[in-house]
């Protein structure tokens, strides 16, 4: 999903990854809750005794806080506007890249469109 943001809006790949990370992580958790809970514990954002669900919630919360602390902008705050047609095109391009298939929860085109809409704000 990062590549289309960079290609259409000239956003650096790492920055587009940062823009997407909290929302895509939140979406992906149901695909492997244990793995994401392990990440939260490794980052010291969750305790060993926390349930996977609680640890995952803390992970997502802290990813949003980290983005706030680092002042990671949204595409919209950078002045980039996109409409449903652009989101559809970007979703098709993201799927064509093959990258979404590496996600623990493989998104559909409509789910990718929705994620872009949410990231845009």
Predicted regions and their residues:
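Active-site segments that bind and position negatively charged phosphate/pyrophosphate groups
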Residues: 1-65
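C-terminal charged capping/lid subdomain of soluble metabolic enzymes
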Residues: 36, 40-42, 46-121
